[in-house]
């Protein structure tokens, strides 16, 4: 028996390939994956035989979309910047050319969820922006309502403050840390 997400999967209402058959399951990927594994353990396996169960979660993979029940976790926390946050990578050419920098490479729409309904915020990468907006569109109405209630004020604040330079870099870091830790919280 096998049941896997397509690619890395989607956080909301993901498509699984269940023994070769694709099917979309409504809900949050971590909860669904865990429930499928527990169901197999309890109800579907041959209990007279040994088994190996490999359980791989979508979290903590990009784009770090938290479950709606975890959106407010860590709201009151400001995470300290790592000592090397503003590293210039002097003398380390390969490190200076990587594309995983919060400052340079973290996409405002795709990674940081600033997909506004007015379509005023744009990514530097049109493909990432399109995909970021598609991730939102996978949600059902209840998921969207919870998501919007949380993210819309953040989006409006982002638009109003027009952060640049260090202020923008540090804002990106806080957004990333909050979303990342909320997403992996679901695995605990």
Task: Give the predicted meaning of each segment.
Residues 4-27, 43-47, 54-188:
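Active-site-proximal cap/lid insertion segments
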Residues 30-32:
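Ligand-binding/active-site lining segments
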């Amino acid at each position: 028996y096998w049941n896997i997400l397509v690619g890395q999967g989607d956080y909301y209402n993901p498509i699984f390939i269940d023994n070769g058959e694709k099917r979309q399951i409504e809900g949050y990927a971590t909860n669904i994956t865990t429930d499928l594994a527990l169901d197999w353990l309890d109800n579907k396996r041959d209990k007279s035989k040994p088994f190996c169960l490999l359980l791989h979660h979508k979290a903590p993979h990009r784009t770090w979309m938290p479950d709606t029940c975890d959106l407010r976790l860590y709201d009151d926390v400001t995470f300290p910047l790592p000592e090397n946050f503003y590293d210039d990578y002097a003398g380390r050419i390969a490190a200076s050319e990587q594309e995983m920098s919060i400052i340079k490479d973290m996409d405002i729409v795709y990674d940081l969820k600033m997909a506004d309904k007015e379509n005023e915020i744009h990514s530097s990468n049109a493909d990432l922006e399109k995909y970021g907006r598609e991730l939102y569109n996978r949600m059902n109405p209840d998921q969207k309502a919870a998501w919007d209630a949380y993210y819309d004020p953040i989006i409006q604040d982002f638009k109003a403050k027009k952060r640049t330079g260090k202020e923008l870099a540090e804002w990106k870091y806080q957004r990333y840390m909050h979303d990342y830790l909320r997403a992996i919280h679901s695995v605990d």
